[in-house]
UniProtKB/Swiss-Prot annotation:
It is an enzyme of class 2 (transferase). This is DNA-directed RNA polymerase subunit beta'. Belongs to the RNA polymerase beta' chain family. DNA-dependent RNA polymerase catalyzes the transcription of DNA into RNA using the four ribonucleoside triphosphates as substrates. Its cofactor is Mg(2+); Zn(2+).
Length: 1417
């Protein structure tokens, strides 16, 4: 393969594109510096390379710098001389890393990638099956290359016997041969143009889709060859390039042996076989021997290029497969991922971390020894500049001896020189942050406790790495962008990430608690100082309730100021905290018991009102106070803190009695095995909860006597305080310590029915211990698997989104998504206020009275979203990354607010990577388990009615009802909802109403809290008729499609429909209830699903609203719900679920029962005129949810099942699809309590919609039904529009993140992701060009990435390049546009003086200035 870079000047970094294509033999020879003729490597006695061998110095260059092999010419002065004795050019030794050689192959050899990488390019080009091509290649069959006048066909295969027979019959009128020569001749003889014409004709005429698809594939391949300038015969090699020797080294190890790269073995085999073949041909050896040797040469080259791709892999002496050229570049250890995307860095160290409770937020403690090693160069230069040392050598000695002056200089060097701390795994950008180092004794790095959450660090032996930014530019970026004080908010959710945890929370909770009857209760103080004095002198207790006079200024988020004055009721502890509360925040924030949530609120409020700097100071002070008081409190865990409730034994006895009853009922066959199991699980979980509740009662209350009176007060029990404050532990853990452990899960998620009645304080018996090992080990195994899976998900997400950067301010679209509150189980889970915050409006917000409240294009901040809430707005249209019209990037308006910075996102922000990190990072917190509905997990009470939780009005949505003979309104629609709005008209509840529910109130009626608005049978779904008439049962035959059961106890008869799989005969019968009028004309037919129990008999008369049959809901409830990480991966991979719901492809009327086949049922959709518009064939086992004659709209569900996102996009449109992915993904995260902003998920969805399928090619070169990048279609349409031609029509197609990553425009990005061989094979045939637009491609070639400061540099250099062209300036003239400079803003002189070479690149200077302007620094 020929990389376009190679012909450029080696030092040049100034290339804009990289092109990859097939290399012709001439190109390979032009790279080469000589032919490798011998398989020898180096002489075992002299250790010098053999001439013409694999390490030959004449071909590849000298071994030592500027010295020829025989030693005649040495030193720099002979540079460029070719020694006449040994033929070596006097040059630097590093040319041995660059100079290639070549091997002239005696016979052509096929490149295995183009043969075996599927689809086989050679097979496709020649229109031959891969098997046949291989038969010819490996000398099993002849192939006819020119049939002449004989009846043989071109490309026909002949065995040896057939070939001999043909020779006898036709003599030499035809040509047939075998091996790579034959393939090469066929490739070279193909007339590409005429083949293309033939294929185009075939595409248009062909009726069969399979043929058409194959023709399109082949047409595409031929077209690429035609367009790319590659010749097909170049897929067969006649010259083999040889890698430079320093890239496949041979190093002597002790004992006179050599360690060598596997490539040398592989090259040796090729050279040996090539030379042997040359000899055999010179000797005119028999054909069979030559053939065998040619085959062996082909196999040797195959092994060198891609070992193991065909047949068994060639192994070395230790039975290990040899590493071929392909293995060198692919996989985690390959060139791409090991050396280009992940490099090791200098000036770094790592050590264990310990806690640094006295540090400030922007500091870290760095061990002196480590700092000295890291900052050595700076120390050396300072020692010289300060006159302490005259040479570097002397400075080095001083540092080694650790003289006193060295430590002083180290102090000055590290002053204000930030270092980067990183903790692996770096799952999001907060995994690397900058700190100012503080020198400490010891060997461990000290870390500030508040940043632990961001690093996910704890101090149980975690290690962290330190990196030193060297250049001034990098120090500046570290300080402005990466300093821990500039990363207060999480980029995933916009919530503070430096909130106190554990001990700090416990300390703050402890001192803000109040205690009845404490010393000094009821006293009045005039100021904080008075309280402090009284507390320190011991006259008042820290928990005493007191009165305090305050006088403070308070700011709100809108910037208004008001005074907070007067006497407040508080406690001593809260008054002591008043000192750390900054001016501008209300005392009411502190004047309560501070649990974790409340502390988080204080920090949040401080950030909103006072800004970053004040927040950092406050966070530090809160931390110091928390640590101080948690130490003073003396809270710790003792055995007596766990109080076992008195009624525990009684409760357990009661449970055991109930279980005994249930077991007896089961034994006398009154209940099923399933019911027995579920009941037992229910009893134990109820008992366990009750014991837990009484334990909490006991632990959470203390009885004290105040002035002789007994009073119950909240307990000061240590365990209770830890859990209550949110510092450590949970109710569930406390229940296991002092209540009962309860039910344990098996690894598959089901519950073990023998509960553990003991708790940890009493201790477990051997059996109980054994029972609990089950679940515990599952947990550990899960965690290990989960980490790897979450990491892989993150990697796929980053790969798909890496090139998505904000590249412009506004794309000008008015498209967007409709946002409303997210409602689950009737409750508002996420209010609109939260979803809308930080988004840009796509349309005006209008109140009910028609007043424009907010105009389109407004960025919604905290104050504006409150305005929405106050005016009862429950739906708005916001701009979204999914609908952004910017090409190859995003615009700032569609993205909205940068969550970590609280203002509109900057141009140049790499939002794609941030989105991927935000979704991937919590992945490790998600569960791996799939949840089972059933077992104790969700056996709550079965819901059979809906009670209103808020007073207001109800409104029906998509609900159709009929009135039955009792006068009740019965719902007959499927996807109906009842919406409850409050007096302001805001949606407060939303409830899904099942078919068959009774609704007592009409739409628009007022309701009070607790009113019932719907009731239904929770155990069965009824089929209800909306017409009156006589029943005719069709295909309901006892013993075949249905079974009669007679209940002895109740005397009831039931008819139940049986499943098709249970029938031996008559599989095409379809049980149906027909309703006919007096004349026998059909009014309605209702298909009966498997398991349906009939409520009517043949010939019975039905009224409107009567129940025809009931489908028991037992069976449908026990399907597994995929949860956790696998569900997120499933969504982003856009997998089609098994037995997905079938959606209607168009509007029309459903017609069933026509022309059903043996296995399948046919659904026809007909238009008004009775013409069939669409037909769908389904297995008979699928249950339809539509009736014959029902009207459906495009996208309505015809057969139920899980949603297929592809169909949703196709039939319901982009908005419904986006909504579905957002809600589904968010619900998984919400279950784990993880907050992720919607826009991150939208950003990934945008990348999943990068391709579109052509519906009508218009006047373009595209082919119908082909899928192409959306950007290319839009660009083509622009051209066509300008020329006044017909544009391309297309529709979006959905691709999973893996497929989307592999089909990006950049082949470098795709190759470094997965399936490297396939990607490179395809790219080289297409002569693909990589425009180096994404982040990954630029990292690979070692440049600034085009985001942030890199984007500014890129824009600047593009501007300069343009000016150069206009002015005709040559490359060596320095030229910068300084017109936009404003030297007053920043004085760069101070920076210049620190840099020895004064010439700072001006465009970097400009970009840094832009960066500084965009951050309020």
């Amino acid at each position: 393969m020929n990389n376009g870079i190679l012909h450029q000047n080696y030092n040049s970094k100034k290339f804009d594109i990289i092109k990859i294509s097939l290399a012709s033999p001439e190109v390979i020879r032009s790279w080469s510096h000589g032919e490798v003729k011998k398989p020898e490597t180096i002489n075992y006695r002299t250790f010098k390379p053999e001439r013409d061998g694999l390490f030959c110095a004449k071909i590849f260059g000298p071994i030592k710098d500027y010295e020829c092999l025989c030693g005649k010419y040495k030193r720099l002065k002979h540079r460029g001389v070719v020694c006449e004795r040994c033929g070596v050019e006097v040059e630097q030794a590093k040319v041995r890393r660059e100079r290639m050689g070549h091997i002239d192959l005696v016979c052509p050899v096929v490149h295995i990638w183009y043969l075996k990488s599927l689809p086989s390019r050679i097979g496709l080009f020649l229109d031959m099956p891969l098997k046949n091509v291989e038969k010819v290649l490996y000398f099993e069959s002849y192939i006819v290359t020119d049939p002449g006048m004989t009846p043989l066909e071109k490309k026909q295969l002949l065995t040896d016997e057939e070939y001999a027979e043909a020779l006898e019959n036709y003599g030499y009128e035809f040509e047939a041969s075998m091996g790579a020569e034959a393939i090469r001749d066929l490739l070279a003889d193909t007339d590409i143009e005429s083949e293309i014409e033939l294929l185009q004709a075939e595409c248009e005429e062909s009726k069969s889709t399979a043929k058409k698809e194959k023709a399109i594939k082949r047409l595409r391949l031929l077209e690429t060859f035609q367009a790319s300038g590659n010749k097909p015969e170049w897929m067969v090699m006649t010259v083999l390039p040889v890698l430079p020797p320093d890239l496949r080294p041979l190093v002597p190890i002790e004992g006179g042996r050599f360690a060598t790269s596997d490539l040398n073995d592989l090259y040796r085999r090729v050279i040996n076989r090539n030379n042997r073949l040359k000899k055999l041909l010179d000797l005119n050896a028999p054909d069979i021997i030559v053939r065998n040797e040619k085959r062996m040469l082909q196999e040797a080259v195959d092994a060198l290029l891609d070992n193991g791709r065909r047949g068994r892999a060639v192994t070395g002496s230790n039975k290990r497969p040899l590493k071929s050229l392909a293995d060198m570049i692919k996989g985690k250890q390959g060139r791409f991922r090991q050396n280009l995307l992940g490099k090791r860095v200098d000036y770094s160290g790592r050590s264990v971390i310990t806690v640094g409770p006295s540090l400030r937020l922007h500091e870290c403690g760095l061990p002196k020894k480590m700092a000295l090693e890291l900052f050595k160069p700076f120390v050396y230069s300072k020692l010289r500049l300060g006159g302490h040392a005259t040479t570097i050598k002397q400075a080095k000695r001083m540092v080694e001896l650790e003289e006193a002056v060295v430590w002083d200089i180290l102090e000055t060097v590290i002053n204000e020189h930030p270092v980067l701390l990183n903790r692996a795994p770096t799952l999001h950008r907060l995994g690397i942050q900058a700190f100012e180092p503080r020198l400490i004794e010891g060997k461990a790095i000290q870390l500030h406790p508040l940043v632990c959450a961001a690093f996910n660090a704890d101090f149980d032996g975690d290690q962290m790495a330190v990196h030193v930014p060297l250049t001034v530019e990098s120090q500046l970026e570290a300080r402005v962008l990466m300093m821990s004080t500039n990363n207060i908010l999480s980029p995933a959710s916009g919530q503070p990430i430096i909130t106190p945890t554990q001990d700090i929370v416990l300390g703050l909770y402890y001192i803000t608690r109040e205690k009845e009857g404490a010393r000094g209760e009821g006293k009045l103080f005039s100021s904080y100082e008075d309280v402090s004095r009284a507390y320190n002198s011991g006259t008042i207790d820290i928990h005493a309730k007191i009165k305090l006079r305050i006088d403070r200024q308070v700011f709100d988020t809108k910037g208004n100021t008001y005074n907070e004055k007067g006497v407040v009721n508080t406690t001593v502890g809260r008054a002591l905290l008043l000192n750390i509360l900054p001016e501008g925040l209300s005392f009411s924030l502190l004047n309560k018991v501070l649990v974790k949530k409340e502390i988080s609120k204080i920090i949040n409020q401080a950030f909103r009102v006072l800004g970053g700097k004040a927040t950092v100071v406050l966070a530090d002070k809160l931390m110091y106070a928390g640590f101080k008081y948690s130490t003073l409190s003396g809270v710790s865990v003792g055995v007596d803190d766990m109080t076992i409730p008195d009624n525990k034994e009684a409760k357990i006895e009661e449970a055991e009695k109930e279980i005994k009853q249930i077991t007896e009922q089961y034994q006398s066959s009154l209940i099923t095995e399933n019911e027995r199991y579920n009941n037992i699980i229910n009893i134990w979980s109820k008992t366990s909860d009750e014991v837990g509740a009484s334990m909490m009662d006991a632990i959470s209350k203390d009885t004290v006597s105040i002035n002789g009176e007994k009073k119950e007060i909240e307990s000061f029990n240590s365990v209770y305080m830890m859990a209550k404050s949110g510092a450590r532990g949970s109710y569930n853990q406390m229940r296991q310590l002092a209540g009962m452990r309860g039910l344990m899960a098996k690894p598959d998620g089901t519950m073990i029915e023998t509960a553990i009645t003991a708790n940890f304080r009493e201790g477990l018996s051997v059996l109980q211990y054994f029972t609990s090992t089950h679940g515990a080990r599952k947990g550990l195994a899960d965690t290990a698997l989960k980490t790897a899976n979450a990491g892989y998900l993150t990697r796929r997400l980053v790969d798909v989104a890496q090139d998505l950067v904000v590249i412009e301010e506004d794309c000008g679209t008015d498209d967007g998504l409709m946002f409303s509150a997210i409602v689950e189980d009737g409750e508002v889970k996420v209010p609109l206020v939260e979803r809308a915050l930080g988004r840009t409006l796509a349309a005006d917000v209008v109140t009910e009275k028609g007043v424009v409240l907010l105009e389109a294009g407004t960025l919604l901040d905290e104050n504006l979203v409150e305005l929405l809430d106050d005016n009862g707005i429950d739906m708005i249209k916001v701009r979204s990354p999914i609908t952004c019209k910017t090409r190859r990037g995003l615009c700032a308006k569609c993205y909205g607010r940068d969550l970590a910075r609280e203002r509109q996102v900057n141009v140049g922000e790499s939002v794609g990577v941030i989105a991927a990190q935000s979704i991937g990072e919590p992945g490790t917190q998600l569960t791996m388990r799939t949840f089972h509905t059933g077992g104790a997990a969700s056996l709550g009470i079965t819901v059979s009615d809906i009670k209103v939780k808020t007073a207001g009005k109800i409104k029906f949505k998509n609900i159709r009802t009929v009135t039955n003979k009792e006068g009740q309104e019965i719902v007959i629609s499927r996807a109906g909802e009842i919406i409850v709005s409050d007096t302001m008209g805001r949606v407060r509840e939303q409830h899904k109403i099942p078919m068959g529910a009774v609704v007592p109130l009409a739409s628009g009626k007022a309701v009070e809290i607790g009113d019932v608005i719907a009731t239904w049978d929770p155990h069965a779904q009824p089929l209800i008729t909306d017409v009156a008439g006589k029943v005719v049962l069709e295909d309901v035959i006892d013993g075949i499609t249905s079974k009669h059961t007679y209940d002895d106890l109740t005397g009831q008869q039931t008819i139940e429909i049986t499943s098709i799989s249970q029938r031996t005969t008559s599989k095409n019968l379809k049980p149906v209830v027909k309703i006919v009028d007096e004349k026998g004309a059909k009014l309605k037919s209702i298909p009966l699903a498997v398991g349906a129990v009939l409520n009517v008999a043949d010939d019975s008369i039905l009224e409107v609203g009567d129940i025809v049959a009931k489908i028991p809901l037992e069976g449908s409830k026990n399907k597994d719900i995929t949860g956790g990480l696998p569900r997120v991966a499933e969504l982003f991979e856009a997998r089609r679920p098994k037995d997905a719901a079938i959606l209607s492809p168009c509007d029309g009327m459903v017609r069933l029962g026509n022309r059903d086949t043996k296995e399948k049922q046919r659904i026809e959709i007909i238009d008004k005129n009775g013409h069939i518009v669409e037909e769908i064939l389904l297995p008979k086992s699928r249950h339809l949810v539509v009736f014959d004659g029902e009207q459906v709209s495009r996208g309505d569900v015809l057969a139920d099942g899980p949603t297929d996102p592809h169909d949703l996009l196709k039939y319901k449109g982009l908005e419904e699809f986006a909504d579905y992915i957002l809600i589904e993904a968010q619900s998984v995260y919400r279950m784990q309590g993880v907050v992720i902003n919607d826009k991150h998920i939208e950003t990934i969805v945008r990348q999943m919609l990068r391709k579109a399928v052509i519906l009508d090619e218009g006047d373009s070169k595209f082919v119908k039904d082909e899928s192409i990048e959306l950007v290319r279609i839009l660009e083509e349409n622009d051209k066509l529009r300008k020329q006044g031609k017909k544009e391309v029509e297309y529709e979006l197609v959905l691709m999973g993140i893996t497929r989307s990553s592999l089909s990006t425009e950049s082949f470098l990005s795709a190759a470094s992701f997965q399936e490297t061989t396939r990607v490179l094979t395809e790219a080289s045939i297409n002569s693909q060009i990589d425009n180096l637009r994404g982040l990954k491609e630029n990292v690979l070639i070692g440049r600034l990435i085009p985001t942030g400061t890199g984007l500014a540099v890129r824009k600047e250099s593009a501007k300069i390049e343009k000016m150069r062209e206009e002015l005709g300036v040559e490359d060596n003239m320095v030229f910068t546009d300084l017109s936009s400079f404003n030297p007053e803003e920043i004085s760069f002189d101070s920076i210049q003086s620190q840099k020895e070479d004064k010439d700072i690149n001006e465009d970097i200077e400009e970009s840094l200035r832009n960066a500084l302007e965009s951050l309020d620094f």
